């Protein structure tokens, strides 16, 4: 499963509107989302409504609350640097999860050797129990925590742009490869929602939320039906089919004898 953020577009005035530069829609209402890492089906979500209220809102509290329905089932959990920390990963292992995620280099508990500068392709690994921390130099420094991988490099295919001329195998840390595969689910669902937004500029924020969640439900249903039927129906075609069936149902709704016609 994957823990990540999604965005419901909204540019009006509201106390808990956020800005997220890496999303297709930059301004809106943020959702914390748990999704199936393989197909992107959203399993659980929570809307961010600011720091008000009695609910604990530290990053660790948020992650543990979001993952509570899935504990003790040996799930791999993918998350990005906003959530990850050695302390959180220890808590998640105690609850039966195997977390994997990029991590901020400033997080408390990371090895001091991670301050060393590396040349491209170099790597530093440090293990504590079943948690592996690594720093790897690609185009930039990559910091990763994983409880599901060994300290090894794996081949990812041919690099056709070798500087020295000729092809050579591209090697990446196993944890980085696993993370890249596991993080696509929510990103794909969020991108699909941005392609087919159900919104108008004049609606209130709560209507934005309703239509945002309605869109999420339709995307979920499209993915589920494709899995069940072994098909690959595009979301656009699926939405047109839904609209057609709803329109036909409206036209064929029988009238009640004796009922007054609406003006």
Whereabouts are the PLM-identified features?
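Acidic, contiguous segments within the catalytic cores of piggyBac-derived transposases
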Residues: 1-263
């Amino acid at each position: 499963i994957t823990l990540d953020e999604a965005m419901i577009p909204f540019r009006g005035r509201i106390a808990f509107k956020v800005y997220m530069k890496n999303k297709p829609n930059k301004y809106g209402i943020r959702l914390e989302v748990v999704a199936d890492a393989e197909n992107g089906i959203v399993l659980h979500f929570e809307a961010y409504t600011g720091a008000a209220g009695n609910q604990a809102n530290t990053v660790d509290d948020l992650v543990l609350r979001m993952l509570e329905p899935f504990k003790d089932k040996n799930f791999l959990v993918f998350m990005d640097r906003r959530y990850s920390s050695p302390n959180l990963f220890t808590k998640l292992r105690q609850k039966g999860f195997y977390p994997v995620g990029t991590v901020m280099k400033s997080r408390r508990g990371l090895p001091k050797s991670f301050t060393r500068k590396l040349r491209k392709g170099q790597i530093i690994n440090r293990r504590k129990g079943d948690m592996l921390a690594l720093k790897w130099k690609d185009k930039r420094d990559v910091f990763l925590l994983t409880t599901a991988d060994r300290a090894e490099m794996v081949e990812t295919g041919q690099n056709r742009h070798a500087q020295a001329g000729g092809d050579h195998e591209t090697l990446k840390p196993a944890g980085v490869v696993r993370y890249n595969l596991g993080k696509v689910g929510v990103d794909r669902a969020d991108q699909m929602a941005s392609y087919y937004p159900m919104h108008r500029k004049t609606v209130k924020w709560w209507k934005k939320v309703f239509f945002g969640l309605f869109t999420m439900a339709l995307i979920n249903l499209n993915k589920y039906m494709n899995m069940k039927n072994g098909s690959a129906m595009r979301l656009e075609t699926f939405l047109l089919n839904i609209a057609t069936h709803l329109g036909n149902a409206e036209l064929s709704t029988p009238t009640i004898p004796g009922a007054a016609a609406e003006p």
